[in-house]
């Protein structure tokens, strides 16, 4: 729209419209964010346009008002001529007015693919005309070639300071567009990228890993990266040998290098008593079995099989094995030494090795010859024992004899000292003495009880009166005390209380309980009781003599009967 009235002041567009125009341009997607610049640059342009309003109005008032039909300025796409403006408005003012109204003039130089954008300089309405998009071929060509210098480069940046109202345009330099921005703005497909000439094409990260590395972990490619054993099925062709030949070493040679010959492997047990002597013997063995024997032994350990077959296929490896201490030494399987039978087995007198050769009992094959066990192993007999070879038996150990020390076992491994023998002897004697003491105490106690009981009975008989002795026809010494029964002379007589007649109470009841009128039955129960206490009734069965020759014929008859029974 034109300004109403020729002499009225030229008021610029309100700030709200400017902000709205900038927002529409940014959100419409006409220009990529990388070409349009950051939001900070947009805000700077808005501020500069607001500052320009007052200055532009003043200059226009001084220069005079142009005609209504001449106040419209149109800006076309890159490469078009600047439209004619009024005579009172300079090119710098027209440029700044267009940039303030549309906010797209500074975008036109950066975006080579934008179409023409027209806007009215004096109106507050910004109209963006549809852009003329480039063809795909043109866009491709423009992306690989630097853009040409536009005719109206004044719109690419803020205006330069003018002298006498004339813009001073500096030298126009071509602007370099980064590779990331070289995209077709109007096309739907991305621009293909071509590598530079003279440089190798980079591969994805997944192609960097060598495939042979995984083949080495496979069972089919076993040994591909480990030097490629001769004749192995998993030899990799992608890793040729630089010297032109494959390594000649095998897995068995590797084991032989890592496990050198050691004389200590042959010792079944280690003596804990003669350490210094063993060290000297080991030095002698190393002198006798030197480096030449080691080389011969390694030659014997080489297998006579195909190089492709390794120990991993179930075949035994030729390595030295430790011999258990409970066995006597002979031949070891897989090498030049094996086990032999114990000396107690005379039937098994020969031991054969893997090479088919045989040695006698007590000899072992070492470095192609049969050697004695006693010579090969000086510490075969422990604790200073002497080793001898006996026919059909083998090695025999004669144990060393010392004062109060004895050795025993097949190889003199057990020790018996005088302290052990003394402990056994003292323990046995103490046990026997303890048993004898217990028996003596037991019988002594029994005898003491019997003696005490007899003494009490003698005292009671010594203090009896003649009347008590007349009634004491059945006195016994082993009657227990504890009751005071009444004693009767005969079963038909009444009971008479007597403190000294307790011994007859038990027998009195036995005799008289069956038949009180049968005194002849007294002898039957007395015989059984008197036989049990025969040894204790010898002294007490006879009553003392009556004083003064007095006595009754009946009492004498009872005493005679009692003596006859005893």
Curated annotation (Swiss-Prot):
Residues 163-173 have a biased composition (Basic and acidic residues). Pfam families: Chon_Sulph_att, Neural_ProG_Cyt. Residues 274-286 have a biased composition (Acidic residues). Residues 371-413 form the EGF-like domain. It is a single-pass type I membrane protein. It is found in: Cell membrane; Synaptic cell membrane; Endoplasmic reticulum membrane; Golgi apparatus membrane. Glycans are attached at residues 38, 57, 76, 123, 132, 143-144, 153, 155-156, 160, 235, 355, 367. Disulfide bonds join 374-387, 381-397, 399-412. The chain crosses the membrane at residues 424-444. Disruption phenotype: Altered synaptic transmission at early developmental stages. Keywords: Cell membrane, Developmental protein, Differentiation, Disulfide bond, EGF-like domain, Endoplasmic reticulum, Glycoprotein, Golgi apparatus, Growth regulation, Membrane, Neurogenesis, Phosphoprotein, Proteoglycan, Secreted, Signal, Synapse, Transmembrane, Transmembrane helix. N-glycosylated. It comes from the Eukaryota. GO terms for biological process: cytoskeleton organization; glial cell projection elongation; modulation of chemical synaptic transmission; positive regulation of substrate adhesion-dependent cell spreading; regulation of synaptic vesicle exocytosis. Expressed in olfactory bulb, hippocampus, brain stem, spinal cord, cerebrum and cerebellum. Expressed by Purkinje cells in the cerebellum (at protein level). Expressed in immature and mature cerebellum (isoform 1, isoform 2 and isoform 3). Residues 56-93, 137-173, 218-249, 263-327, 531-566 are annotated as: Disordered. Residues 442-460 are annotated as: Interaction with GOPC. Binds TNR and probably TNC. Interacts with ERBB3 and GOPC. Interacts with MDK; this interaction is independent of the presence of chondroitin sulfate chains and promotes elongation of oligodendroglial precursor-like cells. Different forms of various molecular weight have been observed. Such forms are possibly due to different levels of glycosylation, phosphorylation and/or protein cleavage. This is Chondroitin sulfate proteoglycan 5. It comes from Mus musculus (Mouse).
């Amino acid at each position: 729209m034109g300004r109403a009235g020729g002499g009225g002041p030229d008021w610029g567009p309100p700030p709200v419209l400017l902000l709205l125009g900038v927002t529409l341009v940014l959100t419409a997607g006409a220009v990529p964010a990388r070409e349009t610049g950051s939001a900070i640059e947009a805000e700077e342009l808005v501020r500069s346009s607001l500052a320009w309003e007052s200055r532009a109005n003043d200059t226009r008032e001084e220069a005079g008002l142009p005609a209504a039909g001449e106040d419209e300025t149109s800006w076309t796409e890159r490469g078009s001529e600047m439209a004619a403006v009024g005579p009172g408005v300079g090119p710098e003012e027209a440029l700044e007015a267009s940039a303030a109204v549309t906010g797209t003039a500074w975008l036109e130089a950066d975006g080579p693919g934008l179409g023409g954008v027209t806007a009215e300089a004096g109106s507050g309405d910004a109209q963006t005309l549809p852009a003329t998009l480039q063809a795909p071929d043109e866009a491709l060509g423009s992306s690989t070639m630097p853009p040409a210098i536009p005719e109206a480069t004044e719109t690419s940046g803020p205006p330069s300071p003018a002298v006498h109202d004339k813009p001073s345009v500096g030298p126009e330099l071509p602007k370099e567009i980064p590779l990331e921005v070289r995209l077709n703005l109007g096309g739907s497909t991305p621009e293909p990228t071509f590598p530079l000439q003279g440089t190798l094409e980079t591969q994805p990260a997944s192609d960097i890993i060598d495939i042979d590395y995984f083949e080495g972990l496979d069972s089919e490619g076993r040994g591909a990266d480990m030097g490629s054993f001769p004749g192995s099925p998993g030899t990799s062709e992608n890793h040729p040998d630089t010297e032109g030949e494959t390594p000649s070493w095998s897995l068995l040679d590797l084991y032989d290098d890592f496990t050198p010959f050691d004389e200590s492997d042959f010792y079944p047990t280690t003596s804990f008593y003669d350490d210094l002597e063993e060290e000297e013997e080991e030095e002698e063995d190393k002198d006798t079995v030197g480096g030449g024997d080691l080389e011969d032994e390694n030659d014997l350990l080489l297998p006579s099989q195909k190089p492709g077959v390794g120990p991993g296929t179930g075949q035994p490896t030729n390595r030295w094995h430790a011999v258990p201490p409970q066995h006597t030494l002979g031949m070891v399987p897989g090498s030049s030494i094996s086990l032999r039978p114990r000396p107690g087995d005379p039937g098994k007198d020969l031991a054969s090795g893997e090479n088919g050769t045989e040695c006698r009992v007590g000899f072992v094959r070492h470095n192609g010859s049969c050697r004695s066990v006693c010579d090969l192993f000086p510490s075969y007999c422990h604790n200073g024992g002497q080793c001898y070879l006996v026919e059909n038996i083998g090695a025999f150990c004669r144990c060393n004899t010392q004062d109060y020390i004895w050795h025993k076992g097949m190889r003199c491994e057990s020790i018996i000292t005088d302290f052990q023998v003394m402990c056994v002897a003292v323990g046995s004697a103490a046990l026997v003495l303890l048993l004898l003491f217990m028996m003596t105490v037991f019988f002594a106690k029994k005898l003491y009880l019997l003696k005490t009981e007899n003494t009490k009975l003698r005292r009671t008989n010594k203090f009896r009166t003649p009347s008590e002795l007349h009634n004491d026809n059945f006195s016994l010494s082993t009657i227990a005390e504890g009751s005071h029964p009444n004693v009767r002379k005969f079963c038909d007589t009444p009971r008479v209380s007597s403190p000294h007649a307790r011994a007859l109470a038990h027998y009195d009841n036995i005799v008289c309980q069956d038949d009180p009128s049968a005194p002849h039955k007294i002898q039957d129960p007395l015989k059984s009781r008197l036989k049990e206490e025969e040894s204790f009734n010898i002294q007490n069965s006879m009553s003392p003599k009556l004083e003064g020759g007095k006595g009754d014929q009946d009492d004498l008859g009872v005493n005679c009967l009692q003596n006859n029974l005893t």
